[in-house]
Curated annotation (Swiss-Prot):
It is found in: Cell membrane. One of its GO terms (cellular component) is plasma membrane. Keywords: Cell membrane, GTPase activation, Lipoprotein, Membrane, Palmitate, Ubl conjugation. Acts as a GTPase activating protein for RAB5. Does not act on RAB4 or RAB11. TBC1D3 is encoded by a collection of very similar paralogs with multiple copies of each paralog, some human genomes encoding well over 50 copies depending on ethnic origin of the donor. It comes from the Eukaryota. GO terms for molecular function: GTPase activator activity. Ubiquitinated by a CUL7-based E3 ligase, which leads to proteasomal degradation. Palmitoylation is required for membrane localization and protects TBC1D3 from ubiquitination. The lineage of its organism: Eukaryota, Metazoa, Chordata, Craniata, Vertebrata. It is a lipid-anchor. Residues 350-425 are annotated as: Disordered. This is TBC1 domain family member 3F. InterPro entries: Rab-GAP-TBC_dom, Rab-GAP_TBC_sf, Rab_GAP_TBC_domain. Expressed in most tissues including pancreas, thymus and testis.
Amino acid sequence: MDVVEVAGSWWAQEREDIIMKYEKGHRAGLPEDKGPKPFRSYNNNVDHLGIVHETELPPLTAREAKQIRREISRKSKWVDMLGDWEKYKSSRKLIDRAYKGMPMNIRGPMWSVLLNIEEMKLKNPGRYQIMKEKGKRSSEHIQRIDRDVSGTLRKHIFFRDRYGTKQRELLHILLAYEEYNPEVGYCRDLSHIAALFLLYLPEEDAFWALVQLLASERHSLQGFHSPNGGTVQGLQDQQEHVVATSQPKTMGHQDKKDLCGQCSPLGCLIRILIDGISLGLTLRLWDVYLVEGEQALMPITRIAFKVQQKRLTKTSRCGPWARFCNRFVDTWARDEDTVLKHLRASMKKLTRKKGDVPPPAKPEQGSSASRPVPASRGGKTLCKGDRQAPPGPPARFPRPIWSASPPRAPRSSTPCPGGAVREDTYPVGTQGVPSPALAQGGPQGSWRFLQWNSMPRLPTDLDVEGPWFRHYDFRQSCWVRAISQEDQLAPCWQAEHPAERVRSAFAAPSTDSDQGTPFRARDEQQCAPTSGPCLCGLHLESSQFPPGF
């Protein structure tokens, strides 16, 4: 038996063991896998959303009691809308009531109608069961799914027990979707989205809700989880235009401090809508998003900029990503009704100015072929040691998304020993990123370039073993090879030896020791201190960069 057969049998046995644990139930796991110890009685420790608290809850306040009475009174109005859906599905009254709040016992039926789940079930009878069984037999990422399921909504009473009923349903949904949509496959965010659906929908309905959320043109979430990335880039360009128009001082400071693009709120928008705020506000924002569609993304972004305008103007280059994410979360640490009130006002203002949705995507933006990365204001190469090219002339909005021919990076000066300075022009690599290795004739494996399209853990242009990994975990894989002294002195040496530079340009590239590493083994590696900055946190001190950055 060769190595391939041994590895295949080992993966099959591992997959069967995981499936068997979920089939046995919450008593099947090991002691360390059981999670938090469940309470014997949940009578006084569970709030109205299902969150289990460590201590007994205090009595209801007058404000909470008033909110409960208001929700009960609104239930009859929502029932009337569901009874005459054709009349209200495109009405202003539906939008107004969505911002005021959707009753919890109406949320499940309303989500089902908004996502057209019943029609999908009628068109695909038995499809979910087929995909689920196929995923159990052939899923290549069941270990990652199992790990993410174990950490999803563990404070909720539905998902508190390890290998419990809801965790088993969540595993089945993610396995089935991995087989149903191979282009997206599995991403970590999908476990949180599917868990929210499972709070109010049955298992099969939650699966089709996930399918509709990513596939429907109204919501366009697949752009955040596919290699095409059209949704991400369109929203990124629109966000830069809207913020520059409404808050010019804020955007000017962002440009000056090189914080635009990579540190935009779109970078953590989906993450915050899932796992960054209280469950009550999360559900209300998802209600608005399901009713409004893609138009709700820009108002949420605009509110974060407007509320945090004073803090953003004080944000420095040191650790910008971590600071911005924390302040974006702090935006929602307030009353839910106040947040929705500001969101509605922002939605109306952007609609009047026609800035609530990005311009239509270019034809190339939806293609699956490898594409050059569009130039954005303040866009920087994120690898440690890369020289920063001087900014070009400001572009008008809307800017062209793709170029007709591969561009060339602007010139940058290279300091040499003795005070000499030489101008370099780096040709753009296959992924649209300026590649010093190609210009210098050095080994291509000595540099790793990662172009970040504003969304964490979703790299679309990774120049290692293919253009894109659909299951790539950004936080565990964002390491960069340290730059050796030979790499730093290579430009100066090649300037003095032009013949060697030409000869080395046609030489076969040397292999990188990391390129042969299996994907799963590399995914488990942590960011070493000597391997450069971790791109997911972007804690980049100014002293870590060369003078030309």
